[in-house]
Design a protein with these regions (language model features):
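N-terminal cap/leader regions of alpha/beta-hydrolase-fold enzymes
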Residues: 1-200
Length: 200
């Protein structure tokens, strides 16, 4: 997926979100199976990955980008899938003068009771947001999507929330059982169009 975005002409930085659990943290193939030991281990690690430390990581990534002479200084885009969807939105709010475009694909916990829930800072975003939601998604259910739509409008956020009909959480990843090629291709089209508009 990183290579595909790179072929469009962008420099792409892919962070290891799990590095706090060890730089060599990996999960076996059964991490995709509900009830498996690997999935439980992944969830235990994930619960410690709250937005504040990830925003510190985002600051470090922006500093790294700025230190690279071969990368033209300018607006930055970010996007995330599943649990990293809220990180992308939070980063757009935390660094509004740098992040001109952000996208979340079947992002979880976009609206929650957490103090750092992304919906609370939509009004701080200066860039454009694109949020794609799956119709069948227990991790980002339709009531949350409907609430987010209302909040989006009230905050005056520039962007779009789109519901992908008939697909499941994880539809963009080719190795998942829920992979849906037409929806996955649409997500690429929407993402690259967003980046072209905002990043050039």
């Amino acid at each position: 997926m990183v290579r595909r975005l790179g072929t469009v002409g962008y420099n792409v930085l892919l962070p290891n979100l799990y590095y706090r659990a060890g730089h060599d943290t990996i999960f076996g193939p059964d991490v995709l199976e509900e009830g498996s030991a690997e999935r439980a281990r992944m969830r235990a690690v994930r619960t410690k990955m709250t937005i504040p430390p990830v925003m510190d990581d985002a600051a470090a990534m922006l500093a790294f980008i700025d230190s690279q002479a071969e990368i033209k200084r300018g607006p930055v885009g970010c996007h995330g899938y599943c649990m990293s969807g809220p990180y992308a939105l939070a980063a757009a709010a935390r660094y509004p003068d740098r992040i001109a475009a952000a996208a979340s694909f079947y992002g979880t916990w976009l609206v929650s009771d957490a103090e750092e829930s992304p919906h609370l800072s939509l009004n701080k975003v200066k860039g454009e947001l694109y949020i794609a939601c799956a119709e069948h998604d227990s991790l980002a259910p339709l009531p949350m999507v409907e609430e987010l739509l209302a909040l989006f409008g009230r905050a005056g956020t520039v962007g779009e929330i789109e519901l992908y009909p008939g697909v499941h959480h994880g539809f963009a990843f080719p190795l998942r059982w829920c992979y849906d090629k037409p929806a996955a291709e649409r997500h690429w089209e929407r993402l690259t169009a967003l980046y072209r508009r905002r990043l050039g």
